[in-house]
C-alpha cells in the first residue's frame, strides 16, 4: 500500500470520514509539498491540498496525487466549503498541531463533527521507505564528513561558537540545507550540560569537548554525537568516556526488532548504573529520527513501543557530572530483521587533539 492507502485504512479504523492535516511535516510526508502554507484534506476517495496563490504551481508540481485548490477566501472558509462539498460528517483534525484559536475558527465555520486525533500520520512515519532511508544515509554521511573535518579545527583557544559555525558551514557546502538543530559544542565544565548549545567559551587543554550535530538534507535529519579530548585529560574523564563508549557499544549490539523502548534503554542504562554513574544519566537512550530530529519511537524507560524493521533511531547514552565534565556518544541506525544497520560511522574510540 502507498501512504494514502495506509492512511485511509487508519481513517476507516477510527470511523472518520476525513482527516485535516495542518502539520507541515505531516503535510510534506503525505504529499511531498514543501511550501510553508497549506492544509491537506483526505477522505476515502479524495485527497485535496488547499493553499494560496503563492504556492499553486509548486503544489501542482510536487503533490501529484492531490487535487490542488487555491483558496481565495480565508483558509478556514475554504476548508468548510470543501468539507460540505465532500459530504464529510466526522472530520478528524491534528490536535497536537492546531492551536485553540484555530480550533475555535474550525468549530465556528465547519459543518461537521470535529474529532481530535493524534499520531495517525506519525504512525506511518515510523517505518521509513527505501527512498527515505537513502536520504537519511546521505544526511548521516554529511555529518560524518563534518566530524572528520572539524577535528582539524578544534584546538585550545578556539571558541565553541566558532566550532559550531564551522560545522554548519561545512555541512552546507556538502549539500545540507542547514544543521538539523542548534549545534551543541560543550567543552570542559560545560560538557556536563546535556544540551550545552555552543557558547563564547574558549576550549582549553585538558578538556572533553562534546559535539552533537546533524545535517538537514532533503527535509530529513541526521543526529550524531562525538566527544573528543583536547590535550591530556584526567583519569576521571577517561573513566567517564570509556564507560559511555562501552554503554553505547552495548546499546548498538543489542538493538533489534522485537524489543521495546524500555528494553533498548536498559541496554545502555544498566551498564552505566553498574559503573556507578546511574544518577548522571538523566535522559533516554535514544529516539526516532526522520523529518523531525526527535520523533518516534522512543528508546526510553517510559516507552513500551516495540521496535520494527525500517524504524530509524539514535543510540546516545551520556554521563554528565557537574563541575567535572561529561560525555555523550551517538549513532543513527535503522532497525533490520537481523538487528540494525549503522548509518553513522565516525570513529568512537577516544580521539586526543
Range-by-range predicted roles:
Residues 1-353:
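Active-site neighborhoods and metal-handling regions in enzymes and metal-associated proteins
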